[in-house]
């Protein structure tokens, strides 16, 4: 029988890395949007309207992705904490 070994610090570290990636990605998206907003302000007509529609879809999709990643990180963190509590409880039964 193989013994299960859990690296709780590693699990939490992985969740933190995902949170960090979300923050970095959000910052880069904001920076890119600021640059594009400057460019788009000089643009007029139907091309501008089409661009704004695509930009709105991009914004929505990138927000959904970041929310999904935040939820993933939170779920990983909570699962690690639950497993740590479970292991502590089981260990306590045999102490």
Swiss-Prot record:
Pfam families: WXG100. The keyword Ribonucleoprotein does not apply. It is found in: Secreted. Belongs to the WXG100 family. ESAT-6 subfamily. The gene is esxA. To improve over-expression in E.coli the proteins were cloned as a single protein in the (non-native) order esxA-esxB with a cleavable thrombin tag. Changing residue 26 to H: Does not form pores in liposomes, like wild-type protein. Forms a tight 1:1 complex with EsxB. An artificial EsxA-EsxB heterodimer interacts with EspA. The keyword Transmembrane does not apply. It comes from Mycolicibacterium smegmatis (strain ATCC 700084 / mc(2)155) (Mycobacterium smegmatis). NCBIfam families: WXG100_ESAT6. Keywords: Secreted. InterPro entries: ESAT-6-like_sf, T7SS_ESAT-6-like. The lineage of its organism: Bacteria, Bacillati, Actinomycetota, Actinomycetes, Mycobacteriales. Disruption phenotype: No secretion of EsxB, very little EsxB protein accumulates intracellularly. This is ESAT-6-like protein EsxA. GO terms for cellular component: extracellular region. Its main location: secreted. An exported protein. Unlike its M.tuberculosis counterpart has poor pore forming ability in artificial liposomes, does not undergo conformational change at acidic pH. Mutation of 2 residues to those found in M.tuberculosis (25-TA-26 to IH) alters the properties of this protein so that it inserts into liposomes at acidic pH, forming pores, like its M.tuberculosis counterpart.
